[in-house]
Regions:
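Sec/Tat signal peptide C-region and signal peptidase I cleavage site
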Residues: 16-21
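Bacterial N-terminal signal peptides
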Residues: 6-15
């Protein structure tokens, strides 16, 4: 188990008007207008061209205050420049980080032995039912999410998203039934549709036996949308409860309420608003987040502390919400099951009369693998798609899609060797690659929403 040396994150986390330790950045666009105030209609100070170097001294909303030639200052939007990757983490890199977030109360954050949750911990961690009950107890309904939006003047906006999956639906469970891990209705259905997927997963290594197992499972064990929904709802608490067994919820009731209200509002703008969405902040200084099947989303305290606004919180949650909407980790579990059990176990568990699979699949899966699936790297396209979805969800939620870019910039400034980013870097594309993809894609139909406060 790797233990990192003492890392001092000493920052003055600032309200408007104070100054950041400067962060180097480079102009990304052919031309960028520098404004006198953080408004698009503010007077123009100058125009910068691609490759020009600037120093960021502060962030206000989704604008950076920058220093340009001869000591002049002005404002550019967060996607006009690209923060330079810090070469290595240390006191200097951390001081330079854009920490104007939740911890921006004039306090100094000192983290000793920063160590992210690793795969072995998640595999071995026991389900913490008390913590799981607490997370579920913090859950709010769609009406509470809408009330949050009304308080802040946010209005739902219709924004098309062709890549969004219309997931399987399921009735929202009661608090009592949701608090207890539930068995899947048809565990074998987990294997049922994998014949067409096995080749891409195992390639030539699978061999004829594995392919036959997949084909047989696909023919013998049908799977309906209702079965998929039941399996996701059963797996979610089992996996989230084990993440909470590795790291408990952060003891900050207001922060937990905040992420649930924001998260529920954003989730209501997706194609799966009826999932029993539950959000939580776990007490670990790392910068990461997790999405378990069935609408369970956990954010590490280290990431939450970076976020300076509700829109930045929504950006992080939106990325994870997309993984739930698209069933990304559920699909990983399906592949693991097929690769692990194969033809013999699949057929052994099939009832010849009904074609269903006996046993508590969700618990059996969790007992074998724990919550290690949370640190399984998804296909890069799935991560890029979740970034795009987060921008869509921000726009639909009445917020500014640029908030995601601001979050990625903050993480970028932590450095390529950041201990706090170690696990995230193992499971996600490089941060600069993610921003490159956003830049190439552009905002197109989302452009009008990038002018929002």
């Amino acid at each position: 188990m790797r233990v990192y040396p003492l890392i001092l994150i000493a920052t003055t986390l600032l309200a408007w008007g104070a100054a950041f330790a400067q962060v180097s950045a480079v102009v990304q666009k052919p031309t960028v207008e520098v404004h006198a105030q953080p408004r698009l209609d503010a007077p123009k100070v100058t125009t910068l061209t691609r490759g020009a170097s600037v120093s960021i001294s502060a962030q206000q909303g989704l604008w950076y205050q920058v220093q340009i030639a001869a000591g002049a200052t002005g404002f550019v939007r967060v996607n006009d420049v690209r923060v330079s990757y810090a070469g290595a983490e240390g006191e200097e890199a951390n001081v330079r980080a854009l920490f104007d977030g939740k911890s921006g109360e004039g306090r100094v954050t000192e983290t000793a032995g920063v160590r992210g949750i690793d795969e072995s911990e998640l595999k071995l961690a026991a389900l913490d039912q008390t913590q799981l009950n607490a997370m579920i107890g913090n859950r709010v309904d769609a009406a509470a999410g809408a009330a949050y939006a009304a308080e802040r003047g946010l209005q739902a906006t219709s924004v098309a998203y062709a890549a969004e999956t219309k997931g399987a639906s399921a009735a929202e469970p009661t608090e009592a039934t949701a608090a207890k891990p539930r068995p899947a209705k048809s565990a074998g259905a987990l294997l049922g549709s994998l014949g067409r997927e096995l080749g891409s997963m195992l390639g030539d290594k699978a061999g004829p036996t594995a392919t036959t197992a997949a084909d047989t499972a696909a023919k013998v064990i049908p799977k309906s949308d209702a079965e998929v929904a039941a399996e996701e709802l059963a797996l979610g608490p089992e996996i989230a409860g084990r993440v909470l067994g590795a790291r408990p919820l952060w003891n900050d009731a207001e922060a937990q309420r905040r992420v649930n209200r924001i998260g529920r509002w954003v989730a209501s703008q997706t194609s799966r608003p009826d999932l029993p969405w539950a959000f939580g902040i776990i007490d670990t200084p790392e910068v990461n987040a997790y999405a378990a099947p069935g609408g369970f989303v956990l954010v590490a305290r280290g990431l939450y502390d970076l976020l300076s606004s509700d829109s930045e919180v929504a950006a992080v949650l939106g990325h994870e919400i997309s993984h739930c909407v698209q069933s990304d980790h559920y699909n990983v579990i399906r592949k693991q099951e097929l690769a692990s059990y194969g033809k013999e176990l699949a057929l052994k568990d099939v009832d010849a009369t009904t074609g269903s699979v006996a046993g508590d699949h969700a618990r059996r899966y969790a007992e074998q693998y724990g919550a290690a699936v949370m640190l399984t790297a998804l296909d890069r396209e799935a991560e890029y798609r979740s970034d795009e979805a987060a921008e869509i969800y921000l726009a639909r939620s009445g917020m500014n899609p640029l908030a995601l870019y601001a979050v990625l910039q903050k993480m970028m400034s932590l450095g390529v060797e950041s201990a706090s980013l170690a696990q995230l870097q193992k499971t996600h594309p490089p941060l600069d690659s993610r921003m490159d993809r956003i830049d190439r894609r552009g905002y197109a139909a989302l452009e009008p929403y990038t002018a929002r406060d």
